[in-house]
Amino acid sequence: MAIREKVFNTIISCFKRHGAEVIDTPVFELKETLMGKYGEDSKLIYDLKDQGGELLSLRYDLTVPFARYLAMNKITNIKRYHIAKVYRRDNPAMTRGRYREFYQCDFDIAGHFDPMIPDAECLKIVHEILSMLQLGDFLIKINDRRILNGMFAVCGIPDSLFHSTCSTVDKLNKATWEDVKNEMVGEKGLLPEAADRIGEYVRLHAGGLGLIEQLLQDPKLSQNKLAREGLGDMKLLFEYLTLFGIADKISFDLSLARGLDYYTGVIYEAILLQPQNARREEPVNMGSVAGGGRYDELVGMFDPKGRKVPCVGVSIGIERIFSIMEQEVEASKEKIRTTETQVLVATPQKNFLDVRLNLISELWDSGIKAEMLYKKNPKLLNQLQYCEDTGIPLAAIIGEQELKDGVVKLRVVASREEVDIPREKLAEEIRRRLES
């Protein structure tokens, strides 16, 4: 839990730095609220039935409930964050950070703004969080649903198959192109020639402005209105990312599809990279740790008059991050402190419980994080051992002589250095030592 608390604090501080306010939404929704929003992943939604026969579902993510919240409260402009549990009928795999109940950490910007400015800020937030958590090298892959849909159109894919084709392309990060093509042709009903044309495009990745310019010159793609719009916005986005100083960690990747039905524009996914070595020329993808995109039409689905509120957001894959950090701590044999206690109030005397209670109360009232052992007459050795076992850096020791002299013996646990401090200055001295 200490690692989790550190990660949560890091993420929340970043969200607040960018001006977000926190909101909360219910753990369960009407089933009809969630259906039709997640494509093929809808089968992973947990269904509930209450005593009156009403069909409910546990929330699958934090995005759809947020959109319903905006529509219900007629909110047209907000920057929010939300950290809460979501639920999926998935196959759990703890080593890969996959669970049926897990936390998501979401940041979203809702409102009518000039193109790509909020989108760029969301990517900047992902960059900041992954940099602060020091998880190693990472890459943020981006694409646009308009470019994908334009690509499908020029490849001869019927409109009715856009969503299912998108879900299949989304599997390219886990499967080979041959497997993906076989699914397109065998299960989705695409012609082999159409699948091959898609293959030519989705193999174009690891690009930036150069790839955007190349696609703008593509004789087929450049004639498609949706694709042109998406490429124009992608070019603008890269200009903003360059100004933010993060373009070197961004890759325009046509194979990125993100299968959720509600995305309408830019989509992105952050992956951790395993460093290259003598046997590997390329860094290896260790899995996704964040994802998100633009969803301009989702709020309108819940508004009685169909009023749209453009939104863009990102979700941090916190469970996978926990899993990685816990493995690193285990491998390093590093001892993690589970509390923030600054000082243990101790005594070598018997029958000094009242003195300890009085002193610890003074420290608590002064804002010092303090503990004591819950025994009337603990041995001093046991008290100091507790400090070492739990990583408490200081011990405030008070005995008969210290009580008579109006001082407290402050002991640095690591060095065993001891110094007498006037009792009224004890809290101030503890702060000074810990700050230095």
Question: Each PLM stretch: what is its role?
Answer:
Residues 142-155, 170-176:
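Short, conserved secondary-structure transition motifs
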Residues 29, 151-152, 156-158, 212:
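Active-site-proximal loop/short-helix segments
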Residues 2-18, 29-32, 62-74, 78-136, ...:
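Positively charged, Gly/Ser-enriched RNA/tRNA-binding surfaces
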Residues 43-52, 157-180:
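Acidic, His- and aromatic-enriched active-site or binding-groove loops in soluble protein domains
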